């Protein structure tokens, strides 16, 4: 490496060693958040930053007129080391509150609660009690609160052992169990509920301990009290206003009707059938300004990606259109995949447009999906029933709870449009959202951030392990 290259490398190293002089949170114009690159916290969906914790911290920054800067740690020990070294104002990464962490850092009020779950692979020996964890190959994420839990349990169960996987997250330890490279792991319920869609053979065997609060952690120093107060006021207001619940729905959703068998079948089809249709779906989705994964999930729910599918009721094609609907949408050949996808996308976008303007996402898409399968009139009946029962007709979870009433013989005769398969509509929407979630998660491993290069290894031998001069 030439002298110019070494100088550039030195500048790069020094550029990364920032954070020691961060202004206090209450005075800062930029919020520096330390987090992890995981599906439940922070990730890139294409070129767009996303994730529940990212969205929550962005909301904090916007409310306080601050810029947001994200710094990613590649392990939990590194995350807390960065916080201890003053490299960020807060650590926000789905962090369970624990005595060990509380001794080192200041914890906010909880913004979620989660349960530690012992996870195994279906078909293998299921652990039914804590004693069943002994003499098993148990893996956990290094630096996690689960290590603290196990260390505490080891006092009464001295034969309990485990392996700690470094620079990993729950997705990776779940993959180890799924691939038979470990027997058991421990994963928090929030992450398990989302990530099980990628590993449908994995099952929660038992709960470990009580539910634990999920908190933001701040440095424990003289400046932490006003900063902690600022964070706590924000989190309390987000709970009270419903903003927190809205973000939970947006990022975690509801998947009550999704079966493990359905997930396995979907994943097999995703590998065998989807590749031949993906580019066409992406093109149609671009034409109609949709996410291709939503369109693909709809097409799978309708026909399992079979362009020649036909039902006993006469609906046909990839999007299972009726003859009447196809004619209204200008679809000449329902068995032509491109025509069918365009017809379905056009119909869905029209339903999305016709919904009241004050229905926000993600509820808007879920309601349009329900209308796609039972009709806008029946959806409106369910919204009216929701409002009459004291629910919010703008929120999908509330409307979802009332859709089955359209089958109740004591209720549907009094609605404007009468009987409808409300239970079927609920399952339809849940399945599509579930399949869309799998497609989203499948795209994440290729877009996850890579750990930093070990710069020391690139330096000439006489410069390794020595402080670099300031230029």
What are the roles of these predicted feature ranges?
Residues 367-438:
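Catalytic and substrate-binding regions of cell-wall glycan-acting enzymes that process beta-1,4-linked
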Residues 142, 308-332, 337-350, 408, ...:
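Substrate-binding/active-site groove segments that recognize
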Residues 32-41, 45-62, 96, 117-169, ...:
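Bilobed "Venus flytrap"/periplasmic-binding protein-like clamshell domains
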Residues 18-95, 99, 103, 163-167:
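Extracytoplasmic small-molecule ligand-binding "clamshell" domains
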Residues 17, 51-63, 122-146, 189-193, ...:
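Extended ligand-binding regions for polar small-molecule ligands
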Residues 92-104, 151-152, 175-210, 380-381, ...:
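A ligand-binding cleft/hinge motif common to bilobed small-molecule-binding domains
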Residues 255-305, 338, 355-359, 444:
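Export/targeting segments at the very N-terminus of extracytoplasmic proteins
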Residues 35-38, 110-123, 189, 193-233, ...:
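Periplasmic-binding protein-like
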């Amino acid at each position: 490496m030439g002298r110019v290259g070494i100088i550039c490398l030195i500048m790069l190293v020094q550029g990364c060693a920032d954070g020691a002089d961060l202004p206090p949170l209450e005075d800062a114009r930029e919020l520096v958040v330390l987090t992890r690159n995981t599906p439940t916290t922070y990730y890139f969906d294409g070129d767009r930053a996303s994730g529940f914790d990212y969205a929550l911290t962005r909301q904090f920054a916007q409310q306080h007129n601050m810029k947001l800067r994200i710094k990613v740690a590649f392990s939990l020990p590194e995350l807390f080391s960065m916080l201890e070294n003053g490299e960020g104002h807060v650590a926000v990464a789905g962090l369970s509150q624990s005595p060990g962490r509380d001794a080192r850092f200041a914890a906010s009020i909880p913004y979620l609660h989660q349960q530690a779950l012992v996870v195994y692979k279906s078909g293998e020996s299921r652990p039914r009690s804590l004693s069943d964890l002994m003499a098993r190959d148990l893996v956990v994420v290094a630096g996690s609160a689960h290590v603290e839990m196990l260390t505490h349990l080891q006092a009464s169960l001295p034969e309990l052992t485990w392996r700690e996987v470094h620079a990993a997250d729950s997705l990776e330890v779940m993959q180890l169990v799924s691939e038979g490279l470990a027997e058991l792991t421990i994963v928090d319920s929030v992450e398990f509920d989302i990530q099980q869609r990628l590993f449908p053979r994995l099952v929660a065997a038992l709960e470990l301990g009580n539910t634990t609060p999920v908190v933001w952690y701040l440095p424990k120093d003289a400046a932490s009290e006003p900063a902690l107060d600022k964070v706590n006021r924000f989190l309390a207001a987000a709970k009270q206003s419903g903003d927190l619940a809205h973000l939970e729905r947006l990022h975690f959703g509801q998947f009550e009707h999704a079966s493990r068998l359905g997930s396995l079948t979907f994943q097999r089809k995703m590998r065998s059938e989807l590749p031949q249709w993906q580019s066409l779906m992406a093109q149609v989705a671009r034409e109609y300004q949709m996410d291709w994964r939503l369109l693909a999930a709809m097409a799978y729910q309708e026909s399992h990606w079979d362009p020649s599918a036909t039902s006993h009721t006469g609906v046909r094609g990839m999007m299972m259109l009726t003859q009447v609907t196809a004619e209204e949408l200008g679809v000449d050949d329902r068995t032509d995949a491109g025509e069918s996808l365009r017809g379905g996308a056009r119909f869905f976008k029209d339903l999305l447009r016709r919904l009241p303007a004050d229905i926000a996402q993600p509820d808007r898409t879920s309601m349009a999906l329900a209308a796609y399968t039972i009709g806008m009139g029946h959806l409106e009946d369910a919204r009216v029933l929701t409002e009459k029962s004291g629910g919010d007709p703008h929120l999908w979870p509330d409307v979802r709870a009332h859709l089955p009433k359209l089958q109740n013989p004591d209720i549907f005769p009094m609605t404007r449009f009468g009987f409808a398969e409300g239970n079927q509509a609920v399952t339809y929407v849940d399945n599509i959202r579930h399949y869309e979630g799998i497609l989203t998660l499948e795209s994440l491993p290729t877009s996850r951030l890579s750990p930093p290069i070990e710069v020391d290894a690139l330096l000439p031998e006489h410069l390794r392990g020595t402080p670099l001069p300031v230029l």
